[in-house]
Design a protein with these regions (language model features):
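Acidic, Mg2+-coordinating catalytic modules of nucleic-acid enzymes
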Residues: 369-421
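An exposure/low-complexity boundary signal
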Residues: 62-101, 171-230, 319-328, 334-337, ...
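Conserved P-loop NTP-binding catalytic core
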Residues: 36, 42-50, 54, 63-124
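P-loop NTPase motor core
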Residues: 91-153, 157, 356, 366-384
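Short, surface-exposed secondary-structure junctions/capping segments
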Residues: 29-41, 150-176, 283-287, 380-400
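Switch/communication elements of ASCE P-loop NTPase nucleotide-binding domains
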Residues: 1-41, 47-70, 260-383, 391-392
Length: 421
């Protein structure tokens, strides 16, 4: 289970930003779950966070930074060998000194009842630092302390890690040691490596949608078929079921059956709407995350789903019976309707709502709604749209039309000047 994510100098996130799922135990709200830790300790942890903000404010970059960290752990040992340096994306608007600064990533997570902190810093050419701490009885144990600026790059306090010399020897300067250990199936570090493989999956409206459609299609022949069909039917799309069609040696395709006056009719996949295909493509990864207790990242949850669909996805992660493994969801959205219910209640608690804004230098600031101290009965959607919490476009009514008319007028004036010369 993910507790916190921190990052700096990554994409539009110039300064250090933190996204936290942990809430005070004395005020956990109705959504937080109590996570038991070794040493008779516990933490109240949220199953879901929504990130809201104006266009180009950096919402998507928060999720992208999380997947950048995942990719570095999974790929740096096996795939970065062909690079002269590291595959990082620093803040692009930095001055020259800022461009050379390291990119920082860190997570706190719970694995088998033990809290772990793992992080690293990537420079242009090499891994500048890497660290791993555990808290088996509430007290920190340092497993790894890597610092490329020292004469002795690796330090192993307590000598807890096996095959230390081998790990040092096999880890290139531009690769993470955890990536080396996981790829080589190290007995102690592989579980943490596998956490990154099984978590922080990113879904956005377009990228890899065909792969997700193919994945859900394969799931229709497995143990999740009944639930996929049920979620297709309950979505009120007129769908009565799905069938997998295998023609020759090509990849399997899916046909969704629809109600008609003459009975069920199977539609070719190309005839399905964008919204239907988006819902179908989401179901495979969604059910896998719920079954595995994984962290799922969904960019622009509202982009291709009706607000009621988006609300039902949120409710799935909130419901302990539907989500018994403690899966977590981080999503971005432009649509504030997901903040509340039609009856005026709150679908998300203030602690689950995070906002993004860009400053004058193009850097994203990520902050929780709780920083604005909303009232206990305050309508979060109305207050957000009114700009009470920030993170909304700074547009006046009719401003776009006025700017367009002014630009058209200037264009006509320039054309007249060219014609007269």
């Amino acid at each position: 289970m993910l507790l916190r994510f921190r990052t700096a100098n990554v994409r539009s996130l110039r300064d250090e930003q933190e996204l936290t799922f942990v809430v005070p135990e004395d005020d956990p709200g109705t959504s937080a779950r109590l996570v038991r830790l070794a040493g008779d300790q516990s933490l109240a942890v949220l199953p879901l966070i929504g990130i809201f903000g104006a266009n180009a404010s950096g919402k998507s970059n928060v999720l992208a930074a999380m997947t950048d960290m995942r990719a570095a752990v999974i790929n740096s040992y096996a795939r970065w060998a062909a690079f002269d340096g590291t595959a990082r994306i620093p803040f692009a608007l930095n001055d020259k000194d800022g461009q050379q600064s390291a990119s920082f990533f860190e997570v706190d997570l719970v694995l088998d009842g033990v809290r772990w902190t793992y992080g690293f810093e990537l420079g242009t050419d090499r891994v500048e630092a890497e660290w791993l701490h555990s808290y088996p009885r509430g007290h920190r144990q340092v497993w790894l302390d890597r610092d490329a600026s020292r004469a002795k790059v690796y330090d192993w306090p307590g000598n807890r890690v096996k095959d230390r010399a081998g790990l040092e020897r096999r880890t290139r300067p531009n690769a993470l040691l955890l990536s080396t250990a996981g790829t080589d199936n190290h007995p102690q570090l592989t579980p943490l490596f596998h956490w990154f493989r099984r978590n922080l999956w990113l879904i956005n409206p377009e990228d890899e949608r065909e792969q997700r459609e193919a994945f859900t299609t394969r799931e229709l022949t497995g143990s999740r078929a009944r639930r996929i069909n049920e979620l297709l039917r309950v979505a009120d799309l007129g769908i009565t079921g799905a069938e997998v069609v295998q023609e020759g040696t090509g990849p399997a395709t899916v046909k969704l059956t629809h109600r008609s006056a003459a009975g069920d009719v199977a539609f070719d996949w190309t005839q399905e709407s964008f919204g239907t295909r988006s819902w179908f493509a989401l179901l495979g990864p969604l059910l896998l995350a719920l079954d595995e207790g994984a962290v799922l990242l969904v960019d622009e949850l509202d982009a291709s789903l009706h607000p009621r669909f988006a609300a039902e996805v949120v409710r799935l992660f909130h419901d302990p019976q539907a989500n018994p493994q403690g899966a977590q969801l981080v999503f971005t959205s432009h649509d504030p309707s997901v903040l509340g219910t039609p009856s005026g209640g709150r679908l998300l608690e203030p602690g689950q709502v995070w906002l993004t804004e860009k400053d004058e230098e193009g850097a994203t600031d990520l902050y929780p709604l709780t920083a604005a101290s909303p009232g206990e009965g305050e309508d979060l959607m109305k207050s957000y749209l009114a700009g009470a919490f920030g993170a909304v476009p700074s547009l006046l009514e009719g401003q776009i039309a006025r700017r367009l008319l002014a630009a058209n007028e200037r264009e006509r004036e320039c054309e007249a000047e060219r014609s007269g010369s």
